[in-house]
């Protein structure tokens, strides 16, 4: 019976026939137990785990001998801090669970030829608790789950969800109230510190976890990622004739809201080591090449992305962690969990903490074992996301929305209503998140995707209310989106960032490579109104054109290391190549080749490099020729490279494949978000007047409200000034802004708002309790899920 169910289910949903095998329960249990023993022994004896324990103890105040601290710290650079673990304990738990399920899956596949030979499905249905993984039958999957439950357990208490709660959970829990995880029963689909999803079944070389490095031509490997970068992604980076850097860096700002993938902590055998010195460790996946004078080395050290178990603790291929919630919910402003959010809040006021002229607050002196910034600084800005210091324009975005929150709090508290600090904070956050969502779907995405894909995926904002929410939509950020498609924004970055004075003349400029993650550079830039000088440049200048090329600051000088703690030996490079990292990260995640994504999105196969009906018809002859000179076979092309070389669609920045992936992902963010700002749900809905005011919000209005020296701005801040996009007076925009309308639109508060805020304030750390749900076993629910229709386009 199980075999029959598996045949029919996968044939209907995927167009593939996978023979699902019943494996003896004892075999499954033995494989899981062996995997648990191997992983536990490895973690307990590893150098990296000793470091993690020391780091947790240091945060808890336990004294650590100086010798232990010095010996425990591996060599770090800006890239390490960019990809760092935000919560070492939770990251380690997820990593252990992921390793156990993957090792056991690999062992079972190796022992069962039928399972190992099962063809990969085109698409996944991750919400279906019944869906067999890697060729396992439903009963075998359940046996596996129960055996691996201990490794998939989350040590955090389970949040008890209140369906009548008006305000979001900080970490994204309790958004989807239909699918509890296994074994905890927590409703954390799309929450921070869970696994990323997938649109397509991965293409790992061993079917489970080994990176994709083999060509489809037997006996050959894929071309070196640095070689692909130099062949395809180098060249003159032209400026855009239409868009401003605000489009670039708003997109980056949103990226840090929806995904943060930490790297593994390799099990080094010696202090101050790195992957170029110990390349054979399983966490290392270096990019090796002939000595390169631009990078000053021959090895780009590369740690694999940290792994996590699946949502239901199923057997199956390697998944990657996401430290952010998979919703457009302002995580980069407010933090990834309650503890981080509380660190950002000003006690007793509802405001976010700021320093000086409403600038970002500086963190306390960093933990020496996990420094967030360069060792010479050892501090960085305190923000909702640890990457706020990455570039100056990104820091400007953080400061803008910090100020926006505090301005809204100031207006709300002037109203004669029963405000509490918690109610002020939550209501202001609710407004800011709605504004972020509206700008994303009304200004940013139309410029990226163009009208065709905005319409296909129903992404246009409605005139007022619209309820597209479905609990059957999986909102999770997917690997293909996070490590390839959405990285198109790297081609939009300028190599030089300027500061423009009130008179419109440049007064300062910085090379991109000189302010990556550099606190002192930012401190030199921002005092005395310099925030507004860079914001002025962002609205008046041009972004780089969307194409296949990356500027020198990203391709040859990413995170240049000049500090005493720079890694040394093993041919390690002094800087990184972002295009090569993107390609290597896609292989690390096991992303299928570009042609598989193109077929999934468009239904068109490509058999040859030639840009004709049976080849790369979405590419120009010039781009197709570059690809044919780089790859041995059309099915070897990496998703990032293939997508970035497609011809752009009319009115868009991208070609059809990346537009499809990004469009579907943002459709899922919208349709899978129970708190989406357009919903008419009586518990959390805005009033018609409030929603109309939010829909009149624009990035230009937020600029005028948060940049006090601005006297004017163009109507659409993401577009350059033109006859169709004229400059308008900021006083006019301020009079139309939602802040000016708060006294009229928020002069009443529903009882549900007061009750929800009171519940949050009185039990901010006690809103937890053990509630293990078995709803995913309900046959009626399984039948409902089985009828779920996949989007076809």
UniProtKB/Swiss-Prot annotation:
Subcellular localization, as worded in the UniProt entry: Secreted
GO MF, one annotated term: heme binding
Domain of life: Eukaryota
Record-stated family: Belongs to the peroxidase family.
GO cellular component, as recorded: extracellular region
Tissues with expression: Prismatic layer of shell (at protein level). Expressed primarily in the mantle with highest level in the mantle edge and lower level in the mantle pallium.
Record InterPro entries: Haem_peroxidase_animal, Haem_peroxidase_sf, Haem_peroxidase_sf_animal
Native organism taxonomy: Eukaryota, Metazoa, Spiralia, Lophotrochozoa, Mollusca
Official protein name in the record: Peroxidase-like protein
Primary location class: secreted
Signal peptide per UniProt: 1-20
Pfam assignment, any one: An_peroxidase
Any single biological process term in GO: response to oxidative stress
PANTHER family with a match to the protein in the record: LD42267P, OXIDASE/PEROXIDASE
Matches recorded under SUPFAM superfamilies: Heme-dependent peroxidases
This protein's UniProt keywords: Secreted, Signal
